[in-house]
Amino acid sequence: MKKFLSFIVMCLATVTLAMAQQAKPKTGGPSIKFEKTTHDFGTFSETKSTQKCVFTFTNVGKSPLIINQAIGSCGCTIPTYTKAPIRPGEKGEIKVTYNGRGLYPGHFKKMVTVRTNGDPSMVRLYIEGEMTDAAQDSATKEKK
């Protein structure tokens, strides 16, 4: 019984130590750096429900950077991105379109998840804004 308990304790200690090891950062590979990771559209009318922005990034690594995918958090957030490999020192873009047509007016915050072959391998970009009700906008115009 003592041997069995000693074996279990040793296994738990080994697993604990193995999980505590930190991953070494990649060196010499591609590395992505965004100029900004959040864009605020501000306030806009429901009648102009489609809004666009561009996130610019640079490959600050030493080998070509590939964007494997960029996925919006919902169907209203549509990213398009540079498909060709980005050489070291060069820039690329991720264009994001928000389409609020048919959605409820108010504040929104959406996310685009970008996956690359570089470091970091995943980056989250955020868009947000305030879409006002079209009926409320027309009532405001009539009062003027």
Can you name each region flagged by the protein language model?
Residues 42-49, 85-87, 101-102:
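Short, solvent-exposed beta-strand/turn "edge" segments of beta-rich domains on protein surfaces
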Residues 1-23:
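Bacterial Sec-dependent N-terminal signal peptides
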Residues 21-56, 60, 131-144:
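Beta-sheet-dominated interaction scaffolds and their linkers
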Residues 60-63, 102, 118:
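Short, acidic/polar linear motifs in exposed loop/turn regions
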Residues 94-102:
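Short, hydrophobic beta-strand segments
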Residues 104-133:
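Terminal connector regions
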